[in-house]
Each structure stands twice: as structure tokens, then as C-alpha cells.
From Swiss-Prot:
This is Methionyl-tRNA formyltransferase. Pfam families: Formyl_trans_C, Formyl_trans_N. Residues 2-189 are annotated as: N-terminal domain. Composed of an N- and a C-terminal domain. The N-terminal domain carries the tetrahydrofolate (THF)-binding site and the C-terminal domain is presumably involved in positioning the Met-tRNA substrate for the formylation reaction. The gene is fmt. CDD domains: FMT_core_Met-tRNA-FMT_N (cd08646), Met_tRNA_FMT_C (cd08704). Residues 210-315 are annotated as: C-terminal domain. Belongs to the Fmt family. GO terms for molecular function: methionyl-tRNA formyltransferase activity. Keywords: Protein biosynthesis, Transferase. Attaches a formyl group to the free amino group of methionyl-tRNA(fMet). The formyl group appears to play a dual role in the initiator identity of N-formylmethionyl-tRNA by promoting its recognition by IF2 and preventing the misappropriation of this tRNA by the elongation apparatus. PANTHER family: METHIONYL-TRNA FORMYLTRANSFERASE (PTHR11138), METHIONYL-TRNA FORMYLTRANSFERASE, MITOCHONDRIAL (PTHR11138:SF5). (6S)-5,6,7,8-tetrahydrofolate binds at residues 113-116. GO terms for cellular component: cytosol. It comes from Escherichia coli O6:H1 (strain CFT073 / ATCC 700928 / UPEC).
């Protein structure tokens, strides 16, 4: 067995909690957990703890929830824990240079892409949107840049034609802990081999916006189908009908050319709602009107056929 490391864990969402759970059964010593402050959630806007906090408190671990790690007293809390390494997974706060240098082995991060491709906030969604054939996780040594540190370990997985951001998230939440445990063993043994990122291969995964998820019919059917999968389950691709936002959960590409203007409804039947795009035809299969549950197109046509008259154009 490798040396047992003193670890500070910093993370916030469920993705991070799955990594903490793996660490708890790895034989290492978790000396402290940092997570974001409780946030208002749900209809009642009640303050809710992060998934990482819930798990940490359940396991009796000391939890710290600073708003920032810039104040000296918060940095001192990190120093007082005398960690060998700090593991950061979707924490959501910037780590100042002083904090990065505190642990003996520095700070390492689990990132949801095969760096240097897709540095930034939304790597899972951007890899789908771009039509990448594969993605994965990279365990990297953190520095002051945005996902610019040396790479310590990578694990890859294929992106299938059915994958959404939700399914890919689950796949990477399985891969990440595997890569993390292996990397910690290598750090403890002194066998880690840091690899500098090739700056010529860098792409950036910009944060998502709801407006970006609005369907632009001038794009190709293939691009729109990828967009629908990339933005599922958040923020969800959508279009506007009679002033109402209607979410699109699933669609397929019909490999046929059409001279109709982008956004023109070509057919509306139980096989789908076929719409002309900038290149090809998009077949809408599952949609969700405002205030309703997601439903098949057949059910939607039973209640709202007037929305989808062939020849009409969708906004």
C-alpha cells in the first residue's frame, strides 16, 4: 500500500461528492472539506447545503464554507490543516497562489475533458456540441491559470450518438474517481509524470447561457441535434411558439435536402415534427411546453396541432 496522504478536499456539486466518496474508501486521511456556502434552492428558496457538505457531515469530516479564499484568515485555515495535497473537483472558488503552494504536493484538479481541449467551465457540453468522438477526465497539477497546469493522468471514453450532457456527466463521474485514486498513488510513490499542455491544441469551453440554447434554425440539422443533447438537462434547447418557451428534449436528423426556408414546418405526424434547417431536416421527437411535463410529439399534436401546421415557420 502506498503512503497514506493527508488530503484537503474542495468541491461542491454531486460530481464532486462522488469523488469525495471514493476518497473516503481509499485509505487516505481526509483532514478537511471545503465547499461553497449553503444556497437558496427550490420554490421556497430555503438554504440548502451542497452535496459535498451533506456527505462530509454524514462522515463526520470538518467542513469549511468560506465565501472566498482570498482573506488571510481563510488561507490560514488551509495552512493549519497541514495537508500533503489538496484535491479540487468543481469547487467553484478561485484558489490564490498562496493556497496552491501550501500543501506539500500542491493542489490537483479533476477536469471533465481531455486537456488541453476544452479548458473552462462547460467542457462536457462543449464536447457534445462540437461533435467530438471522445472525451474523458484529466487530473492536473493546479497553477494560477484557468486549467493550464501540467497533466498528471488521463482517462478517456467514447461519446455515443445517444449521449446527452447528463449521461456523459455520469460516465465522467465514474472515470474521475478512478483517475484520482491512481494519481494520488503515483504522487505518494513519487512516480507521477507531469506532462506540459500543448498550447497549440487549446480550446475553451465557455459557460453556457439560456439564450445560447435557443434553437437557431439557420444552423444545420446535425448541429441542432447535437445542441439538443449538449444542453440536456440544462439549460435545455428551446424555441418560442405564441410567446411561450417550448423545450426540446429529443430530435433526430433526416438526411434529406429541402429548399424550404429554415424554420419551416414540413410535416407533423406521430413520427415527428419535421422542420427545415440551414442544412437538412430536424425531426422533433419529444418536447415540453411551459408548465407541462415533457411529452412525445404525438401527445403534443393531440393537444396543440395548431402550433405545427405544415408551411408555417417556427421562430
Amino acid at each position: 500500500m502506498s503512503e497514506s496522504l493527508r488530503i484537503i478536499f474542495a468541491g461542491t456539486p454531486d460530481f464532486a461528492a462522488r469523488h469525495l466518496d471514493a476518497l473516503l474508501s481509499s485509505g487516505h486521511n481526509i483532514v478537511g472539506v471545503f465547499t461553497q456556502p449553503d444556497r437558496p434552492a427550490g420554490r421556497g428558496k430555503k438554504l440548502m447545503p451542497s452535496p459535498v457538505k451533506v456527505l462530509a457531515e454524514d462522515k463526520g469530516l470538518p467542513v469549511f464554507q468560506p465565501v472566498s479564499l482570498r482573506p488571510q484568515e481563510n488561507q490560514q485555515r488551509v495552512a493549519d490543516l497541514q495537508a500533503d495535497v489538496m484535491v479540487v473537483v468543481a469547487y467553484g472558488l478561485i484558489l490564490p497562489k498562496a493556497v496552491l503552494e501550501m500543501p506539500r504536493l500542491g493542489c490537483i484538479n479533476v477536469h471533465g475533458s481531455l486537456l488541453p481541449r476544452w479548458r473552462g467551465a462547460a467542457p462536457i457540453q462543449r464536447s457534445l456540441w462540437a461533435g467530438d468522438a471522445e472525451t474523458g477526465v484529466t487530473i492536473m497539477q493546479m497553477d494560477v491559470g484557468l486549467d493550464t497546469g501540467d497533466m498528471l493522468y488521463k482517462l478517456s471514453c467514447p461519446i455515443t450518438a445517444e449521449d446527452t450532457s447528463g449521461t456523459l456527466y455520469d460516465k465522467l463521474a465514474e472515470l474521475g474517481p478512478q483517475g484520482l485514486i491512481t494519481t494520488l498513488k503515483q504522487l505518494a510513490d513519487g512516480t507521477a509524470k507531469p506532462e506540459v499542455q500543448d498550447e497549440t491544441l487549446v480550446t475553451y469551453a465557455e459557460k453556457l447561457s439560456k439564450e445560447e440554447a435557443r434553437i437557431d434554425w439557420s444552423l444545420s440539422a446535425a448541429q441542432l441535434e447535437r445542441c439538443i443533447r449538449a444542453f440536456n438537462p440544462w439549460p435545455m434547447s428551446w424555441l418560442e411558439i405564441e410567446g411561450q418557451p417550448v423545450k426540446v428534449w429529443k430530435a433526430s436528423v433526416i438526411d434529406t435536402t429541402t429548399k424550404a426556408a429554415p424554420g419551416t414546418i414540413l410535416e407533423a405526424n406521430k413520427q415527428g415534427i419535421q422542420v427545415a434547417t440551414g442544412d437538412g431536416i430536424l425531426n422533433l421527437l419529444s418536447m415540453q411546453p411551459a408548465g407541462k411535463k415533457a411529452m412525445s410529439v404525438q401527445d403534443l399534436l393531440n393537444s396543440r396541432r395548431e402550433w405545427f401546421v405544415p408551411g408555417n415557420r417556427l421562430a
